[in-house]
Every structure is written in C-alpha cells, then in structure tokens.
Amino acid sequence: MRKLLAAAFLISFPHAVLAQSPELEATCQTVVKNFFLTDKVAVGSVQSFPELKPPGVRMTYSTRQGVGPSDMTDTFECEFDRADKPHHLSRFCVANTCYSASEDDADRKRRFAEMRILLDRVEK
C-alpha cells in the first residue's frame, strides 16, 4: 500500500509543477515593473493558476535588490482574460488595493488602463 501511495504521489507531483505557467508569471512581472517604473524587481514566491477562470498569478516581491525571498512580504496579483498570449490584463492588485476597468476610483481606473496599454504594446 505504501508503494502504491508513493507511486501515486510521484506520478501526480509533476502535474502540480506543470500547472504553473512561466509565461503568465513573466507577464505579471512585466506589469509589476511597469507599475513601479523600474527595470528590476526582486521576486520571491510565485504561484500561477492558468487553469482558473480568470487565470492569474500571485507573487511576493521587493523593489529593493538584495532582499531574500523569505523577507519579501509585499504581494502583487494579476488576473488575465486568457492563459495564452495575448493575455489581456483584466485586474491587478498591489497588497490590498486593486485596479480594474470597472473600478469606481478614477485614479485606480486610469492606472489600470495605463498598465493594460503598456502590456498590450509588449504582447503585440
């Protein structure tokens, strides 16, 4: 029975790893860099969910270089219309503040539009 459980784990573990989407993660990192107006962002833990509707990415980050992944507590989340390119950004959140096209706050709505335009330029 133990061998069967171990075999099942080994077979299913690679599928869990493959569920991550490096392409979505890279796209979200582009949004982070554009949002903070920087070319370098240190990224800690990353989780991507291409199988969800909408597909998304959640990561810890630091705008300061030299920070270890365990010391990164700031979070950034991205949601996209699709898991394949062009992803088309549908929403992003910095900590507890979210930005989207349906946002009531005019500044957040404007900031979202800017990020979507910048991302669309890169993905064309």
Where are these regions (language model features)?
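A short, surface-exposed beta-strand/turn
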Residues: 70-94
